[in-house]
UniProtKB/Swiss-Prot annotation:
Species, as recorded: Bifidobacterium adolescentis (strain ATCC 15703 / DSM 20083 / NCTC 11814 / E194a)
Cell location: Cytoplasm
Classification of source organism: Bacteria, Bacillati, Actinomycetota, Actinomycetes, Bifidobacteriales
Principal place of residence: cytoplasm
Protein purpose: Catalyzes the attachment of proline to tRNA(Pro) in a two-step reaction: proline is first activated by ATP to form Pro-AMP and then transferred to the acceptor end of tRNA(Pro). As ProRS can inadvertently accommodate and process non-cognate amino acids such as alanine and cysteine, to avoid such errors it has two additional distinct editing activities against alanine. One activity is designated as 'pretransfer' editing and involves the tRNA(Pro)-independent hydrolysis of activated Ala-AMP.
Name of the protein in question: Proline--tRNA ligase
Keyword Protein biosynthesis part of the UniProt annotation: yes
PROSITE patterns linked to this entry: AA_TRNA_LIGASE_II (PS50862)
Description of how the protein assembles with itself and partners: Homodimer.
Comment block on domains: Consists of three domains: the N-terminal catalytic domain, the editing domain and the C-terminal anticodon-binding domain.
Family: Belongs to the class-II aminoacyl-tRNA synthetase family. ProS type 1 subfamily.
Gene Ontology molecular function: any one: proline-tRNA ligase activity
Amino acid sequence: MSTMFLRTLREDPADADVVSDKLLQRACYLRKAAPGIWTWLPLGLNVLNKIENIIREEMASIDAQEVHFSGLLPREPYEATHRWEEYGDNIFRLKDRHEADYLLAPTHEEMFTLLVKDLYSSYKDLPVTLYQIQTKYRDEFRPRAGLIRGREFIMKDAYSFTLDKEGLVKAYMDERGAYERIFNRLDLKYVPVHAMAGPMGGFESEEFLAPMEIGEDTFAQSPSGKAWNVEALTTPEPEAIDFTATPAAEKRPTPDAATIDKMVEFANANHPRSDGRDWQASDILKNVVIAVMHPQDEDHDEPWRELVVVGVPGDRTVDMKRLEAQFTPAEIEEATDEDLKKHPELVKGYIGPMALGPQARDGKKAENASETGDALRYLIDAHVARGSAWFTGADEQDVDYYDLVYGRDFEADGTVEAVQVRHGDMSPDGSGPLSFERGVEIGQVFQLGLKYSNALGLKVLDQNGKTVPVWMGSYGIGVSRVMACIAETHHDEKGLAWPAVIAPAQVHVVATGKDAAAFEAAEQLIGELEAKGIEVIFDDRKKVSPGVKFKDAELIGVPIIAVAGRDTVNNGTIEVRDRNGENAEAVPVADAAQAIADRVAALLK
């Protein structure tokens, strides 16, 4: 270590917000160049390379072949798939000196597709799976959590190309199995969850989430063991309610009752329920106006904005992230007061379904409705049962409906998953109530289907001489994020505690004291260990106290620590212990290398 490019820190960096970020910087694995941008130091590169090599071994086991693309890509392929617009502000765009547009690659679907199109033209060429391990770039609005959410990150992305859907499913399952082996070898706990495809497109996707509280993703698990990202969670269709005995809908004044709480208070004070119970927030249908920002498409030369109204039970909170996933590739935000002013039918605090959607288009449009175009789309949350009666807005100031029945008095243009899921909600598979955890996405697999093949013209001749599009799959692992997640789950109060398979070395040898014999014994031990193929870090610093050396060894996180010091000189022994301080023993110098080799072998099993 006297010549190693290394300076450990005693204090956490002021801007580090998660344990992995604090420890990786303190132990000199990384240094921050700018928010979300990192300089990799020798220890960090060592660990990163070992993770990458495990990935390469498992990719080779399924006959995937490695390639490498540029990180600087032309605009045109991304325009052909509409992702130049769909990514919005999330990508880095630039122009060259000739004013041609480029981007820093967020992913490489288009380039892989064009490469295969350029080289392959027959069914005899398929199937093939290609992959790369490369730096990607995304213009994160707020980089956080160190390597977990950065503006640049290292990713393994693989793409399978097959003649038909059956081939795609096989390639998908091969990659999925390889991912499980990779994460198992890395000793990283993971949960495969059903997921939304998002801007990637396709029709089947799973995420691999590492469960941890700092995760940005929430996933739900059913008693049967199945799991879903909450964005992909579907609500079991509620049983329809018989409304034959429900009174006709009635408009009633509800002055100064523009919020859920005030509606409940007013109704309980002025309109007691016939069943004797109090009005509750769950009796109210609240109607939320959102603005949907659609990207440019075949029908629109420019990105365009649409107002949509979503009806949800009054006791539930709208989950904007979950709702947005169903409008992909569009983005959504809450509508502004300026948006509402353009639509007189949207009376703030009293918005209801009768001036919206199918009922407005069927000639029942409220007298004060906008004349600027078709009625706004009206969507209903999946928790709303047909036949259910609601206390909701009447599209007039200080007026609400009572007993407005979904399916009798109003319809919707569609059903959406709009609200936050919560403990006690039923699982989609019907096995019981859901439970929830947070996690960090470490990998995702997609069955892309024909999206990119059709957009970019990737076709081959099949066995009958017919030109057919190629079926594609996409498979990603966040390599640098995986490293952070391992650090996040493998540490204690003293520092990092790497799994032996990716630690920067298997053994950290510390020489202490001023007696040259201790340093000579340490050097002899290191020579014997290296002859056995064991990687070693040697702390040979002469002017550093034993206490500092031990603290650095525990901070750096190599799994086995061997100490040559006073006991070596006096008793002819080397102290060998695990990184966590357990299983300490004094081993004769002559036997130390073999004793350590046995420990290493046990750790690498």
